[in-house]
């Protein structure tokens, strides 16, 4: 899915050439993370804090914006790696940092586990046991993190993060891992589930640009994100989009 919006004449020609060599700023938008983006029920267009940030960046660069919407974090990374997008919105992760220059985080999101009401699991430390199966969104921040941290439990990769709870149910898995907001929505919808009380990780959501675009592009994007946090832009966008449970990252987070 793509969507383009017009803009004014280039406000920063040198940066516009780095970020948008094809003319438009192609922003990869991950619809698999409801904290970052959703589809507007009235228009069907992507909306959310990631869309707002992309829109403002394109405005400052003076180039049109093209939204490249995908269903998973893995797809969003592929867009960057395959030159299908110029910028994206990602959880900071060492593996991804091999190809992507990350800004500081603009939002912190908490990762939680969910289990069935009758599960004997009551705490995070009980998850990494032999015989425990953990559903994660393939290529998501949870997948990358838990692939490093879980040594006894078995990770079961579901195609997209929004499908994790359904996969957890359909495959009779032990645990579902994901964004707290998504898990809460799904638990309320299907019933018979509870979310463990403590988060297992904090996800640092940042903007990213291909490393091939160079240090100047990376520095410009990093400065843009810091300004958007300090000005209240990110907080206002989260509030406008009704996002709860995500907090604006502070400098140095």
Segments predicted by a language model, with ranges:
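Extended ligand-binding regions for polar small-molecule ligands
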Residues: 2-16, 48-60, 118-121, 125, ...
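Extracytoplasmic small-molecule ligand-binding "clamshell" domains
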Residues: 4-91, 96, 228-231, 240
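Short loop->beta-strand "edge-of-pocket" segments that line small-molecule binding or catalytic clefts
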Residues: 24-30, 47, 125-142, 154-155
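Periplasmic-binding protein-like
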Residues: 31, 108-118, 180, 184-226, ...
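Short helix-initiation/N-cap motifs at beta->coil->alpha
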Residues: 51, 67-78, 121-122, 156-167, ...
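A ligand-binding cleft/hinge motif common to bilobed small-molecule-binding domains
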Residues: 74, 91-99, 145-148, 166-201
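Flexible hinge/capping segments at coil-to-helix
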Residues: 106, 115-133
């Amino acid at each position: 899915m793509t969507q383009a919006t017009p803009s004014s004449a280039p406000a920063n020609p040198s940066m516009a050439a780095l970020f948008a060599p094809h003319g438009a700023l192609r922003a990869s938008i991950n619809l698999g993370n409801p904290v970052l983006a959703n589809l507007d029920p009235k228009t069907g267009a992507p909306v959310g804090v990631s869309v707002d940030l992309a829109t403002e960046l394109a405005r400052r660069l003076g180039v049109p914006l093209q939204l490249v919407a995908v269903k998973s974090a893995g797809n969003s990374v592929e867009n960057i790696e395959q030159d299908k997008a110029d910028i994206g919105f990602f959880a900071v992760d060492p593996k991804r940092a091999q190809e992507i220059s990350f800004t500081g985080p603009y939002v912190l999101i908490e990762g939680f586990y969910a289990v069935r009401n009758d599960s004997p699991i009551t705490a995070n430390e009980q998850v990494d046991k032999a015989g425990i199966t953990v559903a994660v969104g393939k290529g998501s921040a949870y997948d990358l993190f838990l692939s490093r941290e879980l040594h006894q439990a078995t990770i079961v990769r579901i195609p997209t993060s929004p499908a994790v709870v359904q996969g957890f149910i359909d495959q009779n898995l032990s645990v579902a891992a994901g964004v707290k907001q998504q898990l809460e929505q799904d638990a309320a919808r299907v019933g018979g589930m509870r979310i463990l009380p403590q988060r297992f990780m904090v996800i640092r959501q940042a903007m990213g640009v291909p490393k091939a675009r160079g240090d100047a592009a990376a520095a410009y994007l990093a400065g843009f994100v810091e300004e958007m946090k300090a000005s209240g832009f990110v907080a206002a966008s989260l509030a406008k989009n009704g996002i709860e449970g995500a907090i604006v990252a502070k400098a140095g987070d």
